Amino acid sequence: MPRNTSHEHDHGLMVEASKPEVAPPPRYQVLLLNDDYTPMDFVVTVLEQFFNLNLEQATQIMLHVHTRGRGVCGVYSREVAESKVAQVNEFSRMNQHPLLCTMEQA
């Protein structure tokens, strides 16, 4: 009688394929920093244009930045955060405002 080779070394143990644990990529907060020169309406425009916020959301964040010195505009992957920081800073300089946008790991 032929031996069943598929079960020849089966000792009742089940081998489960291991799945590598992959941590999610780090997220980054994009921040606006308050200054004494940039008009509030310009900050609202930046928040609407670059972060797709509505007027109410943009106004709330602008007031938070104004009263607390800085505020989170959104949380993104590193590449997206870097792009938004560069876009906002370039837009601010083009419009001759000192508004500063930065990022930090969330």
From Swiss-Prot:
Q: Which NCBIfam families would you find in this protein's record?
A: PRK00033.1-2, PRK00033.1-5
Identify the Pfam families for this entry: ClpS
Please give the organism: Xanthomonas oryzae pv. oryzae (strain KACC10331 / KXO85)
Q: Where is this region: Disordered?
A: 1-20
Q: Output compositional bias ranges, type Basic and acidic residues.
A: 1-13
- One GO-annotated biological process of the protein: proteolysis
Family, per entry: Belongs to the ClpS family.
Q: What does this protein do?
A: Involved in the modulation of the specificity of the ClpAP-mediated ATP-dependent protein degradation.
By what name is this protein known? Answer: ATP-dependent Clp protease adapter protein ClpS
**Subunit and interaction comment:** Binds to the N-terminal domain of the chaperone ClpA.
